[in-house]
Amino acid sequence: MGQGSGDDGVPPAPFSSAAAAAHSPPHSPLSVGVSSASSATSSSSTPPSSTSPAGVSASGARNVETDWKQSGDENLAELCIFHVPDKSVSLPNPKRAECTLPMNLILKSSSKNRKKSSIWSSDHIPRGVRFGPLVGEIRLVDVDTALVCPAEASMAGGGPAQEDVPFDEAPEEWKIYSPSGGRLNKTICVKDDARSNWMKYVAAAEEEDFQNLVAAQIGNDIYFYTVKKIEANTELSFWFSRDYARKLNYSTRPYVRVRRPATQLIPSAPPASASTAIASLAETIVAIDYSVKKLIESPIDTLSTDASSASDEEMIDVEEQESCTRPVAEVTRPNVIQNPVVRPVATKVNNFPGIPVRLGNFYASPLVDFKEFMRKSLQLKLVDTSMFVSPVAQTTAAITATGGRSGQPIDVQPVLAATAGAHFGNYAAIYGSQDFQHELSKPLYTSASPAFGGGGGMGGGFGMGGSAHTSSFHQLPFVNHSSSSHNDSSFNGVPNYVQQQENGKTRYACKDCNKTFGQLSNLKVHVRTHTGERPFKCEICTKEFTQLAHLQKHHLVHTGERPHRCDICDKRFSSTSNLKTHLRLHNGQKPYTCDVCDAKFTQYVHLRLHKRLHANERPYSCGTCGKKYISPSGLRTHWKTTTCKEEDMKDSMRDDLMDIKGEIDEGSMSGSGYGNLGIFENTLNSELKRPLMPIETIYSKYNLPNASLLGQGPSGMQEQQAPPPTSQQQQHMMYGNTMGHMGQGSHLQGPPPPPQHFQMDHSGMQNGGGIPHQHQLIQGGPSSGSGQQQHPQHNGIHRLPDLKNPLLPSLGLPHYP
């Protein structure tokens, strides 16, 4: 073996002339002669073991090829001298796989099976050429099959626990593993010709001499590498690389693919009755952890064989095994286990009608996988019977005596794990529901379908004589899932996320938007934003929430509890997020800046609404007249002042909220600095129910002097009573009202006090500055000499009041200096 063989280093250089001497056995139909010119060597490109002054022997060329076949995937990628891409094909094309064949390759009948096609070379192909990647239909795997045994663990304690290859010529599904081999990321299905490429036709090598390609996983793709020189008119055949074969638990050499070790046949025995056969097997069947459980379908009539005639080294083909009587597989001890733990195994036995069966000690103490039982009983979508019976219970109930109580097997006393009597925690406190506490008093199983037999409940099946047993196991908490809650698709066996590995840490990616999370629980909460699921419902106002914490926070609205207080103005809030947002009004913090006009805001939702002014974005439209508005309040005001029919805006408001949340999740905002998004959500949800607040109501609510603010116009004369605002003016007024509502939280107790150095400048207002111009835009223009109001005309993009005016905090509106 050369210097680069095995695991100790880098294989020889790809242009080694020794590799040009491809070796084929004499009986091979693909034998290629080795000329003297091709056997010339170069000492700089071949290992010492494969070079000689006169030339290269056949054994030296074989060593070089073996070095390449046993190289790691990373070494193969580094030694690639040329990459052959697929031929570009226009889509759609039902024969895409055949049309993607690159140059020097053709598709014709296979040498092993004339009915199937294979890939052949039409010209010389050197060693070190890479083909690929493999193209096919990407299929994600579920959670149960994603985690596999790593390659290192499968080889612990001895030789590798190799599996039989489940295909004859080429696989129809290729598996993509994580770098460690402990997790299956996805599979690539190549059944459909319209969605795959030519690599699906490459046949697997049956013997090592015919192998000229290795299939390696590089990243998340499959590539083929030539491991030796391929002459013209040679059929391409592959086997898996060293690293990829270990991930698949396959042999690294192809010649053991179609053979299995000999199995021991049961010697002939006189026929026995069904009850005797089952009873004898029940006393002897034991299993070891991680071993494959036996499945006995019927008493076996074996053939008389001479055990001594078969040697230990004999290999029995699959066809020979199928022609003989079906043998019982021998229980093998895995290499990982050194001190096995012997325990009884729940064996599936057919119930023979009319024959009373007594199992004796076979089911004396079956060990119930309590953790798995709890997971399925709480997560699976239950059927109309609202019942989940464990597989052990179903098997036990199927084998019963003819005389005895209904549904109760004879001599069956299941023994639970040591954690069966442990307390399961306060589920009522977690879910916060009285209905859940009511469910705690219900037994998990009824007498009509007991899990382990014995009367009503589960006490009778535990050797308690049917008496009431106060263990917490037989009164498991049972959650009655409604149709609108807990619709996690992972309960149906189809996961809604993809597990990934980033920098040695496990990340969970959402299938819908590809966002990644470090915690699986956070991802499950995020998925509810796509499904619209709100499993937590308030019992007072029937409002629904995506998280339990949001429901608990919402309960403070009904109780009126406000535990968080502002140290500056003594205003109280129901949550810390509302308090942090409020403190920005005192310290002047405005972390959100407009990219267009450099306006700054205390909350991100304010900036989001402000940006709609520049972009003329109007997501809320009237279905009757087609007019569009910036905020839901503007559309609601339009419906009040016109004859247009009012519509439901919940969907559009929810989409608007999801857009803002999505921008925050994408990283545009960091930490808790994006402001009180919960207040914005409550505002959107309650916008349709909240009545319109005129500007006069704001003055009376906060005891503001009406004459000092609106009584004096630019001319110094007393203004007449303004007429009711127009629909466009109400839109601006509602926008300011909405901004004030979000800025102060869902419970307005009054605006924060203005700074101590601030004093109201009445002269400025008399000279036409200050707030009168604000309310001229909202309430109406200044009075003319004739005493009639002149309302300004608004064309194009309607501008809002000057949000930088220092009087706005006194009106309950946000202030932006």
Swiss-Prot record:
The keyword Phosphoprotein does not apply. Expressed in hypodermal, vulval, intestinal and distal tip cells. Keywords: Cytoplasm, Developmental protein, Metal-binding, Nucleus, Repeat, Transcription, Transcription regulation, Ubl conjugation, Zinc, Zinc-finger. Signal peptide: none annotated. GO terms for biological process: cell fate commitment; negative regulation of distal tip cell migration; negative regulation of transcription by RNA polymerase II; positive regulation of apoptotic process involved in development; positive regulation of nematode male tail tip morphogenesis; positive regulation of transcription by RNA polymerase II; regulation of nematode larval development, heterochronic; regulation of transcription by RNA polymerase II. Residues 1-62, 709-817 are annotated as: Disordered. Residues 103-241 form the SET domain. One of its GO terms (molecular function) is DNA-binding transcription factor activity. The keyword Transmembrane does not apply. It is found in: Nucleus; Cytoplasm. Transcription factor which binds to enhancer elements in the promoter region of genes. Regulates the expression of the transcription factor bed-3 to control vulval development. Promotes terminal differentiation in the hypodermis and is involved in regulation of gonadal outgrowth and entry into the dauer stage. Regulates the timing of dorsalward migration of the distal tip cells of the hermaphrodite gonad by inhibiting precocious unc-5 and lin-29 expression which in turn prevents early dorsalward turning. Plays a role in male tail tip morphogenesis. Interacts with dre-1; the interaction targets blmp-1 for proteasomal degradation. Interacts with ldb-1 and ham-3. This is B lymphocyte-induced maturation protein 1 homolog. The lineage of its organism: Eukaryota, Metazoa, Ecdysozoa, Nematoda, Chromadorea.
